[in-house]
Amino acid sequence: MVRAKRKLDHIEYALSTGQSRTHGFHDIEFVHQSLPNSSYETITCETKIGELSLSSPIFINAMTGGGGEKTLHINEQLAYVAKHHNLAMAVGSQMAALKDESEAASYKIIRKVNPNGIFFANLGSEATVEQAERAVDMVGANALQIHLNVIQELTMPEGDRDFTGVLQRIEEIVLNSKVPVIVKEVGFGMSKETMQQLASVGVTAIDIGGQGGTNFAAVENERRQRMLSYFNNWGIQTATSIIEATSTNNNLSFIASGGIQTALDVAKAIALGANTTAFAGYFLRILMEDGIEKLVDEIDLLHTDLKFIMTALGAKTIEELQSVPLVIKGETYHWLTQRGIDTTHYSRR
């Protein structure tokens, strides 16, 4: 019951605290092209994460599950939206269902709604190989997300305090998993050092989960008597984390998430090097406040606007969008300079 109550608390406080929008994309500007030699009607948006082919560079990221009927209904609606738009979708952490079988229905519902969809299972970095296998089987997953959430756990009143052995556990899961493993942050971003460590143990896909969206330190602080306010502004902004990712020069696929709300955010994330982008808090707010049809319409508009932007830039495919010139300014440029990451190739390609 404690875990289920926490799941419901997370939904409530995620909606009430909102998204910070401190993702850093305001520091990224495209170089205008007056002769793009492109046509809106021929723009294609297919992309890949590793060996997984996706019809869109937008997918529905992990949100919830394991909180009884309310979370079942949310996942049911999200699965419908994913089916309508042929989007990939991740479920929230399944540890609740591994510990309490009665909660499994709130995750399994997605396959009932969308039998042929692409779904990602989800567990924390404390998971064992056996738990990872059960989570994948529970939803017939095409991939497994392992989330890293140190700051959230430290801020959580009942959270973990021991993070030793995490890389070794991830390596064991990667070696034994029958589906691709995606390691993701939950809103605090990833450094190039972390990504290099993950690549060294065989991880091939990373969701950078940057600062700028739902702030889980702020969410957990709402649940505390004594706030750990120093964690509320902790992390690496989404735009910065994408560039840190691409600077590693590893053969990794990258998912950009963290405050992404617009087609321009999507285009900038991909142009910086992401293979796809993920929405969570923004979609949840629309669903909860305006309903499922409004969310369906919003995703239609996102795809339309993304194709407009790609047409303006002369990028006929997602791969071409990854090579358009752009300029990095402001705090993002300052951070990257201090970190020894050269940005000139973005503006001169």
Swiss-Prot record:
Q: Which GO terms describe its molecular function?
A: FMN binding; isopentenyl-diphosphate delta-isomerase activity; magnesium ion binding; NADPH binding; oxidoreductase activity
Which Pfam families does this entry report, sorted A to Z?
A: FMN_dh (PF01070)
The Enzyme Commission number assigned here is 5.3.3.2
Q: Where, in this chain's numbering, is Mg(2+) bound? A: 153
This protein's cofactor list reads: FMN; NADPH; Mg(2+)
GO cellular component term of the entry, any: cytoplasm
Q: Which residues bind substrate?
A: 6-7, 152
- The UniProt annotation places FMN binding at 62-64, 93, 122, 184, 214, 258-259, 280-281
Q: InterPro entries from the entry?
A: Aldolase_TIM, FMN-dep_DH, IPdP_isomerase
One of the GO BP terms on file: isoprenoid biosynthetic process
Keyword tags: Cytoplasm, Flavoprotein, FMN, Isomerase, Isoprene biosynthesis, Magnesium, Metal-binding, NADP
Assembly, in brief, is: Homooctamer. Dimer of tetramers.
Q: NCBIfam families of this UniProt entry?
A: IPP_isom_2
Instruction: Cite the PANTHER family for this sequence.
Output: ISOPENTENYL-DIPHOSPHATE DELTA-ISOMERASE
HAMAP family (alphabetical): Idi_2
Member of which family? Belongs to the IPP isomerase type 2 family.
The protein's name in its UniProt record:
Isopentenyl-diphosphate delta-isomerase
Q: Which organism is it from?
A: Bacillus anthracis
